Amino acid sequence: MERIRLDLSKTGSSVASYGETAEKFNALLDNGTGRGSDFLGWVHLPSSITEEELNAVEAAATILRERCDYVINVGIGGSYLGARAVIEALQNSFEAYRSDRENPVILYAGNNIGEDYLSELLQFLRDKRFGIIYISKSGTTTEPAIAFRLLKGLLESQVGREDARERIVAVTDSAKGALRRMADEEGYRSFVIPDNVGGRFSVLTPVGLLPVAVAGFDIRQLVRGAADMQAMTASDIPFSDNPALRYAAARNALYAEGKKIEILANFHPKMHYIGEWWKQLFGESEGKEEKGIFTATVDLTTDLHSMGQWMQEGERTIFETVISVENQDTCLTIPSDSADLDGLNFLAGKRVDEVNKMAELGTRLAHVDGGVPNIRIILPQLDAYYIGQLFYFFEKAVGVSGYMLGVNPFDQPGVEGYKNNMFALLNKPGYETESAAMAGRLKEC
């Protein structure tokens, strides 16, 4: 099988001088001796997933598929983005509207606290056959905990507590936490989130594999792609042949030149959530100690009609990483029209994908001409195998890139700030001192 390819020819920077450093940090990852070593379980995960583990995930997915028309994936951040990225990249864009669909529609909750969203979801699910996958290491993360309490109540009111427990699967800690306790007491089927795998690196654990399997996609191909990329980016692969190290080096070279913003661009609507997953992976891993490349995403050509002007002529603090897809499964040809009022007959007989590819090439050339360094990642096609490769490529790259930046890529202390303020404002037990301080602060506003 082919591998995804990396093109750095349009970056305008030399990465060779970063090779020795990148190789050193890659060895720290592979040996488990770098910063954040308690959370390096993802490094060798793809090649260590067993047949027994895959069988268990597929068996649980089969039960949910047989009993449910809708399955609600409850989680936030790394607890849901990876699965959603795979599902939305692979499924028919209009799957939810197809009368001949064979698998449950995957819906999402717990990724926001929008009352209108949750209310409308509950209204929609009334009298529907639905199940729940609740993903949380602790079971106390506010957004998914609220969503699960509401969904669990609705499900039990519709089918009874006994039947509801057969439609709920928990993915959580092996021994501790509110969700582990609830799963044990209620008798929910459950899977373990490994202690040494952080949320944003968890897509190849049951966190990502179970929802993907429920949606009907081949988790074995996903894992195989990741395992192959694990081998392609291992510490025994030299810098010159190691795509993850070269990408990490290019990012750091551009950052050193004042390029503080990386824009990940795709030209396929199905790839939107791959961008969202990437944005969390890199943003949460590197944005600390007042350092880090700001991660942004655009969906092209759509966003060329909004962000295109800024990308072409705005402040030159950006670089662009484009994910290209070489081959499409579909084939749609533009027809001829005798009147040709829209002037499109020059495209008659061409595939829509050919026009899209020329739009991509034209955009890349224009941005390079406008002073935007360009990195290109080429996928032979958009399928489970190459998405598996892509995920592991990005995971290994961000580990090395974070080390090169001088930060611990595997913690996220900054996310506690908003939570502490929110809990103080809501008078959560244990936050009395913070609540009093917050009250005084608000009086001054």
UniProtKB/Swiss-Prot annotation:
Q: What class of enzyme is it?
A: isomerase
- Pathway annotation: Carbohydrate biosynthesis; gluconeogenesis; Carbohydrate degradation; glycolysis; D-glyceraldehyde 3-phosphate and glycerone phosphate from D-glucose: step 2/4
Catalytic activity reported: alpha-D-glucose 6-phosphate = beta-D-fructose 6-phosphate
| Pfam families recorded | PGI (PF00342)
Q: Does the keyword Cytoplasm apply?
A: yes
**GO molecular function list:** carbohydrate derivative binding; glucose-6-phosphate isomerase activity; monosaccharide binding
The listed locations are:
Cytoplasm
Q: Which sequence ranges form a coiled-coil region, renumbered to this chain? A: none
Active site: residue positions? 284, 305, 419
Write out the similarity annotation.
Belongs to the GPI family.
- Role description: Catalyzes the reversible isomerization of glucose-6-phosphate to fructose-6-phosphate.
NCBIfam families hit by this protein: PRK14097.1
Q: Which HAMAP family match?
A: G6P_isomerase
The entry's protein name is Glucose-6-phosphate isomerase
Q: Which organism is it from?
A: Porphyromonas gingivalis (strain ATCC BAA-308 / W83)
